[in-house]
Amino acid sequence: MGTKGLPLYPDPCRAPGTKTQNTLASDSLAREGPSSNSSFHSSEEEGTDLEGDMLDCSGSRPLLESEEEDENCRPLQEKLGEAALFSESGVCTEPEERGQGGKKSQFLPINQRASDDLGEPDVFATAPFRSSLVPADDVDIFSKAPFVSKGSVAPSQMDEVDVFSRAPFTKKRSMEEFLAVQGSSQDLPMQANLSQSNEGPLLAGRDRAIYTPAQAQYPMTGFAPQAGLPSHSVQVADHFDGNSPRGSPMSSGGHPVDRNRGLQPQKEAFSGPAAGKPFHPQALSKYSRHYSPEDELSAEAQPIAAYKIVSQSNKQLLAGSVSVTSLSSRTTELATADPFALAPFPSKAGKQKP
């Protein structure tokens, strides 16, 4: 159909038949190059091809008729191609815009997407992370945590009892404890005065306490004065007791000291069932390494009294009896037998100077 009275195909290159032939010829030339079998070249062109490419005065190759036709038809083809590309690009841009619109819809805020839905609950609203737009009535999930957040700390919680005050270290004393300590410090001088006034009875009780374990350690049956003991042994004990510091009639506290106070437990022990049995230390001599049968023969020897001071504070006397012959026999045996003579090293007395 013509436009503005022009013929349908004014130009032979615009005809569809010639157009297809020209395109086929250009494609074959582009692939195979000029050859002798081509129907578009004459014998003269074949001769010139064999001789070499002939150049014009400008240095460029002269154009052939087929190439001129191709150049005439090429602008139209380019226009048609551009139009087709434009139409295709227009068609393609619409889906791209639609795709971009879909992508933009994906990046919408969560709350806006939730509002666009038909009343469906937003699953991300209950997620542990928070969105950028948090509603005002949102519940703080950290308020139920075991730790206390800084913003929700109440002033009443800051006044809690200090847990370190109950610990054994760095204990803080309250006012009541401080007053109690002051009261106890005031009572100390009063107790000191009372202790000074009662020094005599306290010392007497201390002597009794010291004498009691001594009495338990050494039974009174062994130290009781028996009928076999001479009278001068008891007199020596009384004389030694009279010369002791305890013999003063008045103590430091002003109380009189009873001389027979330490002898009262002895008198009580005299009335025991073992008071009638005499004590013979010679019976224990057989367990000694210096035992000899001569000790049994000298059992009739006269015993003497021996004294032992238990402590410096009470000056109590404990009497015992040992035989004189046993002591003499022991000393003579020890003097005659030298224990160092049997030692592996020689003694100094045994060495003779050359």
Curated annotation (Swiss-Prot):
Residues 182-199 have a biased composition (Polar residues). Disulfide bonds: none annotated. Residues 45-54 have a biased composition (Acidic residues). The modification N6-acetyllysine is found at residue 19. PANTHER family: AP2-ASSOCIATED PROTEIN KINASE 1, PROTEIN KINASE DOMAIN-CONTAINING PROTEIN. The keyword Acetylation applies. The modification Phosphotyrosine is found at residue 291. Keywords: Acetylation, Phosphoprotein. Residues 32-41 have a biased composition (Low complexity). The modification Phosphoserine is found at residues 115, 174, 292. This is Uncharacterized protein FLJ45252 homolog. Residues 1-74, 87-115, 182-208, 235-298 are annotated as: Disordered. InterPro entries: AP2_assoc_SerThr_kinase (IPR051744), BMP2K_C (IPR028182).
